[in-house]
Every structure is written in C-alpha cells, then in structure tokens.
C-alpha cells in the first residue's frame, strides 16, 4: 500500500493514478520501495539466524564468569586462603566458625587462644607454607584423604581432610583442630563453673577422682572460673597448656584465691593420737601434723580449734580466728592445749585405774579358780556369786556348766580397764584350756560395798 502525496488517498502499489484526485504516481519511487522492503526482509532473516548463536555465546561467557567466581571462593586454594586470612588478621570469630563441628562447638575466645598458639608454636609464615603444601598434595592425591599440620615439637595442631566436593568441580577441604580433655582431681567434691563453646558450663568432680571438664582445641588456656566446695566459693582461673601433654588429656592447674591451713598442736602429748580433731568453721576433721586443711576462700575469716581425749575426757583448745587479711595460700597456725590440766587429770585417772586394776586382778584371780571348779565339779554354785543373777551371761554360764561345755581359764592379766558410773569394762588376757592366749572383754557392775559381778563377755 502507498499514499497519494496530494490528497492522502491509500492505493495499491501497482496503481499508477490516484482514483481520488487523479494524481499520477512516480513508478521509480515504487520500484525503490519494493527493493528496500526486500532488503529489510533479507536482513531480518539473517538476524533471526544469528540470535541463537548470540544467546549461546552469552551463556558461555556467563558460565565462564561463574566458574571463575566459584573457583575464587570454593577451590581448595580459596578455602585455604580464607583460613589463612582469618588467622593472619586475628579474626577469632571467623576461625571459630571454620573450626566448629557438629560435635565440638568452638567459641571466639577459644579461637583467639588457638590463633596465638599457632603463631607461638609454629610461626605464621611456616604455618601458611605447611598448610598450602598440605592442601596442594591432598588435592593432587587420589589416595590420601587427610593430613596434619604440626608444631615445632611434633604435636598435631590442625587436621586437613578432603570431604566430598563443592559444585562438582572442587574438592571440599575440612579444617579441624584436634582436641584434648583437660582433667581436674580435687581433694574434695567440687563444682566448677566456667564458659566453654560460647555457653556457661558446670562440672561436678568427686573427691580424689579424675574428672574431664570438656574438649578443647590446642592452646595455652587461662579460663575465668568459679568453684564451690563445702568450705565456700572461690573466684579464679583454670589453667592448662597443651605443650605439657603428649596424651589425650592435659592436667589442669587451679589458680584460685584460696588459703590452705597447716595446724601445729602444743601441749597434746598426753592425748590419744586417734582422738585428736581439728574444727575449722564448725567442721570437725581428724588431725594430722602432715595434713593441709582446705582450701578456704581468702576473702572470709576462718575460725579454728582442736580437741582430743585423755583417759576418756575431752580437752579443747581456745578457738582462734584468722582474719581474711592474714590468709595466704599456705597459712600456718599453732593451737595450744592446757598441758598442766591434762597431766593432772591423767595422773588422777592413772591412780584410779591402778586401784581399779588391783581390784580386777583380785576379782579375776578368784573368778578363774571358781570357773575351773565349776567345770571340774559340774556345779554352777562355785561360780554363781561372780555373775549377776538375771543377766544373759548368768544364764549362759549356768547352761554351759550343766552341759559340761564350760571352758577352763587360767593366768588372767588385766590389759585395760575403764569405769563409767557403776559399770566397768575390762580387757583380760588369759590362757584357755587349749593353752592358747586369748583376749576377752568383760563388762562388770559394781554394787553395794564395791562388790563386782560380771554382766557379759565377748572375744576381742
């Protein structure tokens, strides 16, 4: 279609004269327009053929760009560079993220210790070189899947392993720090509270029992902590150093504000050793000159006293108070008994015991003769006056006499004797009918006119 230049009437391309106004169309102009339309149509066909190739080319360019982008962030070398940069820049949060596993969460403070440990025990330059060489060898190897970076002393500090692939093309490298268990062994039941893996943690350790407090990556640690025992609460640190261990555990050194008490007793020579006690803050314990008591918090006063027995009587020292300002890690204190008071009492009791022993010697000499006469004559009356009527021992001896099973005794010796009111306990060594020496414990009752009678007996 074409338009009349004079009136604007539409006409077919092959029409020579306008039907509206009679204008004669130029035939050369129509021919030119036809040629131009054919060229445009030809060019359009060529363009349509080129579009798919252009799209393919564009996609290839995008794929190449994407590949290089992925390689920059996901190749083994790129993964290595991320870890190296984090360590070089002391990026503890990034290192914590890279080293954390499902089973062991690493927090930023632990990562900070780890970074310092690498720089001290390997050296940053050497670590980077070892890491790059290890990754390169693993990446090229078809058999090896893991290797370790070590400190100058030969301890493993980082495990590098192949763990599948990333985006099909790249080996996925895993960086894992080996762990050890720090262990405590307190003298008494202790509760420890500290932060680990980004969370508050509580560990309860029984007395004299090895107890792990968790899993930690290599480093030299000084962890703020609180501990609680029967003696009080303590603020301080749990310290441990991987350099000091060649096993799967590392010993913890406790650094708390605590005082340990060494006690010396004076004036106690007459006291029974097994009866000596020390009371610290109302808690009574057996005394030993070689024992250290504690620990106790250094921020609280301590009260302390001692006690012991002599001849059945308990003697005590004065209670002393150790001010918090005077407490040290090792604190010594001396407690004094009234030695004159103890010696006077012991002397008095020994006189009484000697008098009592003499009575008992006389009593058991007669009792042994009466016992043997009752056995020989099968007559309980010989021995009945020595035993309290109505007691179980009275009935037992009477029955033995009637059955002829009473044991003969001789040579009684008084080993020990104590009197409590009208009751007397005596340890007597004698010879039985088989000629064997035996120790027997007797209980006697002292009646009117100091008359002694047996109540019961037992083998020592």
Swiss-Prot record:
Keywords: Antibiotic resistance, Cell membrane, Membrane, Metal-binding, Transmembrane, Transmembrane helix, Zinc, Zinc-finger. InterPro entries: Mem_prot_TcaA (IPR023599), TcaA_2nd (IPR054529), TcaA_4th (IPR054530). Residues 1-49 are cytoplasmic. GO terms for cellular component: plasma membrane. Its main location: membrane. Residues 71-460 are extracellular. Pfam families: TcaA_2nd (PF22813), TcaA_3rd_4th (PF22820), TcaA_5th (PF22819). GO terms for molecular function: zinc ion binding. It is a single-pass membrane protein. The chain crosses the membrane at residues 50-70. A zinc finger (C4-type) spans 4-21. Induction: Induced by cell wall active antibiotics oxacillin, D-cycloserine or bacitracin. Plays a major role in decreasing resistance to glycopeptide antibiotics. This is Membrane-associated protein TcaA. The gene is tcaA.
């Amino acid at each position: 279609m074409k338009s009349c230049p004079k009136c604007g009437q539409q006409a077919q391309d092959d029409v020579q004269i306008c039907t509206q106004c009679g204008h004669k169309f130029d035939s050369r102009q129509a021919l030119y327009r036809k040629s131009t339309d054919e060229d445009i149509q030809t060019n359009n066909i060529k363009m349509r053929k080129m579009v798919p190739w252009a799209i393919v080319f564009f996609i290839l360019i995008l794929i190449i760009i994407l590949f290089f982008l992925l390689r920059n962030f996901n190749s083994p070398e790129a993964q290595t560079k991320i870890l190296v940069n984090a360590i070089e820049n002391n990026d503890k949060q990034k290192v914590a993220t890279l080293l954390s596993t499902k089973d062991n969460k690493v927090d930023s403070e632990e990562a900070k210790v780890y970074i310092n440990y690498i720089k001290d025990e390997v050296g940053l330059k050497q670590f980077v070189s070892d890491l790059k060489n290890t990754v390169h060898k693993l990446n090229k190897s078809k058999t090896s899947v893991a290797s370790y970076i070590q400190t100058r002393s030969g301890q493993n500090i980082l495990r590098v392993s192949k763990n599948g692939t990333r985006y099909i093309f790249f080996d996925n490298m895993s960086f894992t720090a080996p762990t050890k268990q720090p262990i405590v062994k307190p003298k008494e039941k202790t509760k420890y509270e500290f932060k680990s893996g980004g969370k508050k943690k509580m560990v309860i350790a029984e007395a004299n029992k090895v107890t792990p407090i968790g899993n930690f990556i290599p480093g030299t640690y000084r962890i703020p902590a609180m501990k609680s025992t029967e003696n009080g609460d303590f603020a301080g640190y749990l310290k441990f150093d991987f350099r000091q261990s060649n096993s799967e555990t590392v010993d913890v050194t406790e650094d708390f504000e605590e005082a340990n008490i060494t006690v010396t007793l004076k004036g106690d020579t007459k006291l029974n050793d097994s009866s000596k006690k020390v009371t610290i803050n109302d808690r009574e314990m057996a005394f030993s000159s070689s024992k250290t008591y504690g620990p106790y918090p250094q921020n609280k006063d301590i009260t302390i006293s001692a006690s012991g027995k002599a001849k059945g009587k308990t003697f005590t020292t004065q209670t002393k108070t150790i001010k918090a300002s005077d407490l040290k890690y090792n604190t010594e204190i001396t407690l004094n008994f009234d030695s004159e008071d103890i010696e006077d009492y012991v002397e008095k009791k020994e006189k009484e015991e000697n008098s009592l022993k003499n009575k008992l010697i006389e009593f058991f000499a007669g009792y042994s003769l009466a016992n043997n006469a009752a056995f020989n004559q099968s007559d309980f009356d010989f021995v009945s006056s020595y035993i309290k009527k109505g007691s179980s021992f009275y009935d037992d001896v009477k029955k033995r006499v009637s059955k002829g099973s009473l044991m003969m005794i001789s040579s009684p010796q008084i080993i020990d004797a104590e009197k409590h009111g009208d009751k007397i306990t005596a340890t007597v060594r004698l010879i039985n009918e088989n000629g064997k020496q035996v120790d027997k414990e007797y209980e006697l009752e002292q009646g009117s006119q100091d008359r002694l009678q047996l109540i019961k007996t037992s083998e020592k």
